């Protein structure tokens, strides 16, 4: 029996700026990573997005990033461990409040953009994030890629860890994500994305950008909500998985 979660980064609009196709994407995912106001999102959008997830029976997670609206949280910032820990606590707490007044709880936490990538390789940053999550709620699941500093930090503080892969991103031979600056970082071919995802779930391998096969662990598959093809990607990926005997469930039900 195969089972997997499908997640997407949503709630990234703010003020007069609309980003993503959240109202459509939520129909095909099982977990949502909601921006918490630092790299994107605002109080009105956070409230709307939590409501949207509850309406579509989608589990809710916090998506904390660096305080960098202009860079959409994709620029590396020089922040201390204490600063990062407090950034994450602040953002989890904000979303946690919107969930609590609606009678629900957060399922997971997934760092955003540069913070996610830095935590994959920097032990201090990863530990700051893990300690922040644990200090708020030890029942929260930490989301990240396998064989990373983030996985090791989550294990050290006793958090459950969900192994993530990306439907629309190429990977390097070491399993890390290809930089968005690379022309082939993003996978735009739906059929190719579906084949890659199915192979990752059923065989535990993924073809790297140089053609080598990389072993992967998969609990949750990310489809980026700010990608113009996000809706069609999410729909096709879910259909492909279900047609091939894979159950789609929120990560909290099996991690």
UniProtKB/Swiss-Prot annotation:
One of its GO terms (molecular function) is ATP binding. Its EC number is 3.5.2.9. Coiled coil: none annotated. One of its GO terms (biological process) is carbohydrate metabolic process. The keyword ATP-binding applies. SUPFAM superfamilies: Glycoside hydrolase/deacetylase. It comes from the Bacteria. The keyword ATP-binding applies. It catalyses: 5-oxo-L-proline + ATP + 2 H2O = L-glutamate + ADP + phosphate + H(+). InterPro entries: Glyco_hydro/deAcase_b/a-brl, LamB/YcsF/PxpA-like. Keywords: ATP-binding, Hydrolase, Nucleotide-binding. Forms a complex composed of PxpA, PxpB and PxpC. Catalyzes the cleavage of 5-oxoproline to form L-glutamate coupled to the hydrolysis of ATP to ADP and inorganic phosphate. Belongs to the LamB/PxpA family. PANTHER family: 5-OXOPROLINASE SUBUNIT A, UNCHARACTERIZED PROTEIN YBGL-RELATED. This is 5-oxoprolinase subunit A.
């Amino acid at each position: 029996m195969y089972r997997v979660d499908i997640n997407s980064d949503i709630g990234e609009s703010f003020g007069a700026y609309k980003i993503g196709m959240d109202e459509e994407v939520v129909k095909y995912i099982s977990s949502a990573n909601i921006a918490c106001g630092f790299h994107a999102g605002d109080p009105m959008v956070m409230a709307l997005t939590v409501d949207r997830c509850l309406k579509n029976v989608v589990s809710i997670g916090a998506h904390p990033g660096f305080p960098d609206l202009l860079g959409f949280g994709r620029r590396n910032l020089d922040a201390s461990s204490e600063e990062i820990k407090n950034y994450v606590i602040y953002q989890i707490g904000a979303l946690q409040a919107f969930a609590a007044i609606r009678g629900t709880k957060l399922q997971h936490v997934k760092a955003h953009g540069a913070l996610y990538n830095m935590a994959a390789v920097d032990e201090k940053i990863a530990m700051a994030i893990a300690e922040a999550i644990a200090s708020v709620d030890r029942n929260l699941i930490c989301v990240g890629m396998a064989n990373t500093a983030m996985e090791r930090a989550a294990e050290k503080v006793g958090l459950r860890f969900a192994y993530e892969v990306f439907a629309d991103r190429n990977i390097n031979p070491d399993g890390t994500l290809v930089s968005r600056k690379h022309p082939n970082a993003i996978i735009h071919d739906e059929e190719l994305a579906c084949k890659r995802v199915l192979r990752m779930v059923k065989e535990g391998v993924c073809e790297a950008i140089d053609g080598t096969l990389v072993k992967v662990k998969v609990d949750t598959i990310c489809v980026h909500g700010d990608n113009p093809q996000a809706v069609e990607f999410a729909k096709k990926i879910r259909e492909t998985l279900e047609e091939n005997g894979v159950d789609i469930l929120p990560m909290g039900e099996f991690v």
